[in-house]
Amino acid sequence: MANLIIDIGNTALKASWCDGITLGKTYRYQGERMLDFILSMVEKEKPEILVLSSVRNFTSANIQRLSEVCDKLVVVDEQLLDLYRLPSWLTPDRAASVIAARYLFKGKGCTIFDLGTTL
């Protein structure tokens, strides 16, 4: 069973199915009905783990709905920042980058360039 990672930024929703650290098919959506788009992605295949990083306000009802379509929902929020001892001023997308880099480069120094839509 695959996992689904989703990043909702200021400009668009980006998502990818993945198996471990290997990314699969990726998606980009720029409409207003983000929850509906996510639900359409999981109609045919239920993700084991769904990871959500969002700089937009995602209601608790939407979070609850997402928890119903996967085995485990991980939301990059203040609790996750505390768990990884990250500063509270980090946005969820940047925090996800730091957590991933720590996993991929365990015990090594690492510099992360995360420019979002700056370029």
Tell what function each PLM region has.
Residues 1-24, 101, 107-119:
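Gly/Thr-rich phosphate-binding beta-strand-loop-beta motif of the actin/hexokinase/Hsp70
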Residues 35-44:
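Short amphipathic alpha-helix with an adjacent loop that forms part of the alpha/beta core around
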Residues 82-112:
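Conserved phosphate-binding catalytic cores of ATP/NTP-utilizing and phosphoryl-transfer enzymes
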Residues 39, 63-64, 98:
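Short amphipathic alpha-helical segments and helix-helix/interface helices
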Residues 31-34, 56-58:
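Short beta->alpha connector loops
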